[in-house]
């Protein structure tokens, strides 16, 4: 069970952004062992949980409040926005940000 007092971040468990996401977390000073097969990793030095999931699942996890933020590629974001528009939803509350 995830603790709601901790920040929950979803990243790809494998794929193009997996290693870049790990590197970003490390550069942010987040110490976490992501080299195991566990799907949930706890940061050692901050109240942060890292969830390793399929990239296509990350937008839904954010929208459903399972995680607080996630790292996805532009292709996944565009696909999710198109799906929400097709379903008649207003995708503006899905708030994309770019980190360079």
UniProtKB/Swiss-Prot annotation:
Q: Which reaction does it catalyse?
A: 1-(5-phospho-beta-D-ribosyl)-ATP + diphosphate = 5-phospho-alpha-D-ribose 1-diphosphate + ATP
Keywords annotated in UniProt: Amino-acid biosynthesis, ATP-binding, Cytoplasm, Glycosyltransferase, Histidine biosynthesis, Magnesium, Metal-binding, Nucleotide-binding, Transferase
- Name where it's found: Cytoplasm
**SUPFAM superfamilies, A to Z:** Periplasmic binding protein-like II
> Per the entry, what modulates this protein's activity?
Feedback inhibited by histidine.
GO MF, one annotated term: ATP binding
Write down what this protein is called: ATP phosphoribosyltransferase
Primary gene name: hisG
